[in-house]
Amino acid sequence: MLFEQWAPCKDLALVYSDRDTWDSMLQQGVQLLERFTQDGRVKIRRPRSQQQIQFTRRLTAGNSFVGFVDAIGELDGTPCVLEWKTSSARYPSEPEGIVALDPQLICYSWMTGIEQVAQVVFIRKRLVEVQYLRATISDQQRQEFQTLVEDTVKRIEAGQFLPHSGIRFPQNPCSSCPFLGLCLDQRQLIDTALVRKPGVDLGLFDELAY
């Protein structure tokens, strides 16, 4: 199946990183699947119907939130929502509880009503690795996420598009954030990104201490 899906890409004009080729990525994919199978920690009893599952949640204003869950199955015998990930590095597992803060896992739990969630991370490196991260999402987290969703819908309908941070996970380089440079007081980045409107007195910010 992997070869069948990957074979049509061989003749495409794809741009690979310095260390990657079509053959090397195929080999890594095979090795990752072999490791995943050998671990034997994940079970999906009905793979044809329990993967890429569509869920629809009705919101209070009459709107619908539509999402797709990667899979519902078991990790180490515990029923849970499963999320597949690929990465070139391990995801952080400390401090304790950090996995439960992942917005996508909270979303999956809210969509399905299932409190147990897990990430299965296929790590592409010289010695391949599969990482298993589990978390329990609380009722409070699900309620807060629904409030966030409904508030976001209201802002979209009102045409309010507020800036938000652009931190990438797990490496977390600041690459696409509207506040780039401000949090670390990097003056060159601030001068490049900051727009000063005519007639606005910003002198008070010179008095702030960080």
Q: Locations of the language-model features?
A:
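A residue-level signal for conserved active-site and pocket-lining positions in enzyme catalytic cores
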Residues: 29, 71, 177
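Residue-level signal for well-ordered alpha-helical scaffold segments within enzymatic catalytic domains
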Residues: 31, 35, 80, 106-110
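Non-catalytic protein-protein interaction segments used by genome-maintenance enzymes to assemble
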Residues: 53-107
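Conserved aromatic-histidine-acidic binding/catalytic patches
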Residues: 17, 21, 93-97, 137
